[in-house]
Structures are given as C-alpha cells and as structure tokens.
C-alpha cells in the first residue's frame, strides 16, 4: 500500500508536510486541527524565556496586492506571548494525542545571549517528549536591537555558541533557522553543522517597510494610525 510516511532528521511522521512556526501554530488547538486535517508535523510558534517584550497588537498582518491578486503579506508580529510553562503543557498534550506526528519547538532568546536560559529551556522541552528543536536565528523582530534573532543568524560565532549550548543538553534533532539576508548563508549553515546541528531551516521573512495607502496616507497594517518596521512573506519574496 502506498504511503507518504517519512523520516526527517531521525523523526518519523505520517507525511513530509510540516507547518512552519507562524500564526497557524499559535496554540495547541490550532495545531491539533491541522493534524486532524492531514498535516504530518508542526513547529510551534517561536517562544522566549523572558516575555517582557512579547506583546502583540492587532491588526499586525496586511496583504500585499498587485491589482486584485495577493502576492504576499507584511507583518510586525512578535513571538508567542505565552509563557514557557504553558507551552510545555501544550507540547505534552499534543504528543499524548498525536504520538505519530512530529512536534518541534522554536526557541528565541530575548535580552542578551544567556547560556543558562538556553540550556534550561532545552532541558525542559527535552523532558516534555517533543521531537526536536528549531533555533530561531532569523527573526527580524526577535530582539535584533539586543543582538538576538537575525543578529545571531548573521554571526557565525554566535551560531556556533548557541547551537552548541542546545546540542549539549539534548539528543533530539537541533535545527537552526537561518536568515536569507546575510552575506554568505552557506558559511552560516556550515557553522551550525560544526556545532552539531542535524538540519537547517531556511528562510524566515524578509525585512520590509509598511505599505502606505496613497489615497488617504494611512499605513498598513495600522494600529491607531501608526505602523512599524515590518517583514514580508509569500510569493513576493520567491
């Protein structure tokens, strides 16, 4: 009998179709519905050790159109505002209900590269029964001003350092997610491999600016008439 069952980085799943870390994996209920609909795995919404900076507003996503056709989306969404304790609970629930499906977590530091924070979170999820780790080294909204997110992905030594911290705390697959807007993404991937990465995820959204409605000069997306630095996804960046 034909089957789509596959193995990725040593993890078995019903098929090779896996939801990326994004709004569709914001909570365990949404992930469960995706599994019921046929998806083989999911990377949970990026989470951070410290939630001080995680406050999303609405609306934060806008469609980029050419004529009436949608070619992409811009957004200024941050990581998950839920605490690690809630994600641990959700991850356990998902693996109990869907033991055959792949569940990866996506980790992001907040303020400063604090070794023990990365190690502690890795140990907690390793013991929660998940299948693997994505290391978000590519988020433009991931505290880049404090040296995080895409700033890590642009620095080979930082990639090696953080990947090694996580690698030393787990035998599960470790998958750094690298940004496209770096001088040499190949050398960044090599740095991750040398630190023990099992796979590489590429790419994240690309830096952009919010659009402007030229008829009323309102930016989009807009909250109370204001917008912010954005990123773009979809067909427009291919």
Predicted regions and their residues:
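N-terminal capping/small domains of soluble enzymes
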Residues: 1-103, 108-115, 120
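Alpha/beta enzyme core
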Residues: 32-37, 41, 96-97, 110-238
């Amino acid at each position: 009998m034909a089957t789509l069952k596959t193995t990725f980085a040593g993890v078995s799943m019903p098929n090779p179709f896996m939801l990326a870390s994004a709004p569709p994996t914001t909570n365990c209920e949404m992930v469960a519905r995706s599994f019921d609909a046929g998806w083989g795995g999911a990377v949970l919404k990026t989470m951070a050790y410290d939630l001080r900076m995680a406050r999303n507003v609405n609306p934060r996503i806008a469609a980029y159109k050419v004529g009436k056709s949608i070619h992409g989306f811009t957004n200024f969404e941050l990581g998950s505002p839920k605490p690690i304790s809630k994600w641990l609970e959700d991850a356990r629930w998902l693996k109990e209900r869907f033991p055959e499906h792949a569940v990866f977590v996506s980790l992001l530091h907040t303020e400063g590269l604090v070794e023990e924070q990365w190690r502690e979170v890795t140990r907690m999820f390793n013991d929660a029964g998940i299948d693997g780790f994505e290391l978000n080294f590519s988020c433009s909204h991931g505290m880049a001003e404090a040296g995080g997110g895409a700033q890590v992905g642009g620095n080979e030594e930082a990639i090696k350092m953080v990947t090694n911290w996580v690698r030393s705390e787990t035998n599960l697959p470790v998958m750094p997610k690298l940004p496209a807007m770096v001088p040499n993404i190949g050398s960044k991937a090599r740095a991750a491999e040398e630190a023990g990465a099992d796979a590489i995820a590429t790419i994240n959204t690309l830096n952009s600016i919010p659009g402007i409605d030229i008829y009323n000069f309102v930016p989009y997306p807009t909250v109370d008439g204001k917008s912010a630095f954005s990123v773009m996804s979809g067909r427009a960046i291919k």
